[in-house]
Amino acid sequence: MNSDLPATGTVALLELLDPLVPDDFINQVWPHGRTGGRHRAHPAAQLFRVHLLSLLSPVHSLNLLVKLLPEQRAWRTCAGRRRQSRVPDVRMLHEFRARLGVAGLRRINQHLLQPLVEAYAWRQWSVGLIDATDLPAACGGFKKSTGHYSARRAALGGRTLKSGQSRCFVGYKKHTLRLWLHDYTVGVQLVPLVSWVTPANVSEGGLLAPSLHDCQRQWDWCPPLVVADMGYLAAQAKRRCREHWPVAVLTKLRSDMKLVAPYVAWNQAACPQGEPLAWLGYDGRAGEHWFGAPAQPQLCGQCWEAARCPRQFAYRPEPHETLLGRLPLASPMAQRVLQQVRPWIEPAQSYEKHQLGLGSVFLNGLRFTWAMALLADAAVLLRARALLERPIPRPLLSGLMPVQLSLELGADAARSVLPTTNLNPQNHQ
């Protein structure tokens, strides 16, 4: 998440993001009208800005933020409240979250995401990344009287074993499908398309299809290539994504999985006689992958079947969705994406948990956790829009710097995502 923007938590970043907050949209959807009872002292946009301050400022507590607002003029300016005596209290913030709900916060994020999707997503080689991150709950322990943890809807779940962390934790998980803005060449920029928050014991793979369905319903589009980790190995979910939406879900192969023809290794395909095969493309009409011998074969000249061998072989993806899914692992594109794109997800998760402070918030309920997770997505979207609207700096020594972010997917991606490609040479005769 390194960029030319000011550091997160500084007043300079707040001033930069201030004009990008959609105040008119928020006030129009949730108007500041009569309630039939106590009058609302603050418009919806101002309360939304106060919630953003809990992530964009060094104070990651709403209770402490309310107490510090009268002392911080820059924070009050960002929240739209210049008077010290007219700051919202904790009750107002709670009522605002109850009024918007998860659907309302998602609607705001979709409004922020719309120009990014229109500008960057409509490409044949758009790449999405999906993963889950752990959010430990502020839990005092397991209550024997109720049979539940003190944090509402918290559960015992597992996470990737890292130094200084235990294998299990009590809390929640944030599942996010992100889009890589590949036209931004200065650095890697990921924006969240859709996020879910569940108890920690919910499997990651079960939210793959709902995430793509939500993108298709909202934008009439979903990324044709999704990179995931080992938690999304389920063949049934991959088959559903391949059949309902022409989406290739790329994951690595588990070590105990068996190989199927034409694979002799997880990244190498070969004919029955041992000649290495190259992936030629996917025939969307027949639903088959075509593999062929290279231009200069090694074993075809000595093969006893050379006279009748077509040197091109078709395989359907149903026998193994990981090896022969929408995009086979033997293709150079799949290997390049898994090696280069997959590690980008960890810095994005680390930015939300540590710099935005999502991991430091007092998460004592599933509903509150979901609201703060969507607010973190809103902060990332605002930051991405501010970054894309700034002029791209061109260092004087740019020609001497190594290029580390090039990912040429044009030719291979076009062959993999076009469903009408006919790669069978016999059909032209």
Language-model features: locations:
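Short helix-capping/linker segments at secondary-structure and domain boundaries
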Residues: 57-64, 182-185, 380-392
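Short amphipathic alpha-helical "interface-anchor" segments enriched in bulky aromatics
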Residues: 18-21, 70, 263-283, 328-366
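Dynamic "connector" segments at or just before major functional cores
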Residues: 1-57, 62, 74-78, 84, ...
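Short gly/pro/ser/thr-enriched loop/turn and capping motifs at secondary-structure boundaries
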Residues: 255-260
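Polybasic low-complexity intrinsically disordered regions
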Residues: 67, 93, 98-230, 234-246, ...
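Nucleic-acid-interacting cores, centered on viral/eukaryotic replication and modification enzymes
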Residues: 32-33, 82, 97, 116, ...
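Basic, amphipathic alpha-helical segments enriched in Lys/Arg and hydrophobic/aromatic residues
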Residues: 333-419, 426-428
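Cysteine-cluster motifs in flexible loop/terminal segments that predominantly coordinate metals
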Residues: 265-329, 333
